[in-house]
Amino acid sequence: MIREAQYLQVEEAVKNIMGANLKYEDLARELEKLIGDKYGSLSTDTNPAITNLAHWQEDDIRFLVKEYSGFSNDSIHLFHDALIRLEWDGVKEEVKRNLSEEMGALTNDVPHLELMRRGYKYELGVETEGVEYSQCTEALLTRMRRIFRNSNNAYLCGALLALEATATFEFKGVEKILRALKHKMDGGEIAANSVTGQYILGHVSDSPEGENPEDDHYAGMRSAIGSYISAEKNNDLVRGFVSVCTALNSWWENISIEVYSRKLDLAPSN
């Protein structure tokens, strides 16, 4: 059974937001509330891939990590796609700042993706290069590329805002997945000084307070975009934001279903 109620609620909420003629600061707050209140898979506590971890075996979680790596690998290209099409200098500078951190500005010049690839392969046994992805992951990547190659700058900024707004809770969920895999493997923990540990700390950290990298990215992006959004651009911003949130929410649902369907693929080998 699909959870259609959340999508109907999103649709109704979006209609109300688009009809309210809000100032940018109020608009951003309403969009933030959409994530927490309407999109079940974008919250760590209700994401089905997190809530079902206890029922999955090591190979199931490895599959999930491999599939998510496809989005991680593509994300940096989404920023580059946006940068090519952006005409608003302040937003371009913020995208460049985020890209510099992804390329290792805060991790001793080691790109985040390289930390991910090394850690996943050598510490968690997950290969992320030259792999095939499921249809639902390929559909997500195609959908996101289409969104971030749109030349409407307000729409594009809505997409960028959503990518950053969802990042902290999303990566806290990914951290839970990675730690669950490590525990399934050998009962151990991911050390902070391990390659995977460094990768995690490059994205989320609850200590010290206020030092969460993804929260900083979102605050910077929200501020930069605000300089360019006027009332006539509100609705395009909302459309871009909702497009990304809906794509990610539905992917988490679909990939969780995919894990279970793989477990029930009982065809004998030839």
Model-predicted regions and their roles:
Residues 7-21, 27-58, 73-76:
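Short alpha-helical hairpin
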Residues 23-37, 93-206, 246, 250, ...:
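Active-site-proximal alpha-helical scaffolds that flank and shape metal-associated catalytic sites
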Residues 48-57, 75-97, 177-186:
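Helix-loop segments that flank and shape redox-cofactor active sites
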Residues 57-65:
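Membrane-entry segments of alpha-helical transmembrane domains in multi-pass membrane proteins
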Residues 66, 93-97, 235-242:
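Short, charged, amphipathic alpha-helical segments
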Residues 82, 94-98, 171-172, 208, ...:
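A structural feature that tracks compact, well-ordered secondary-structure segments
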Residues 192-241:
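Accessory, usually C-terminal, subdomains that scaffold auxiliary metal cofactors
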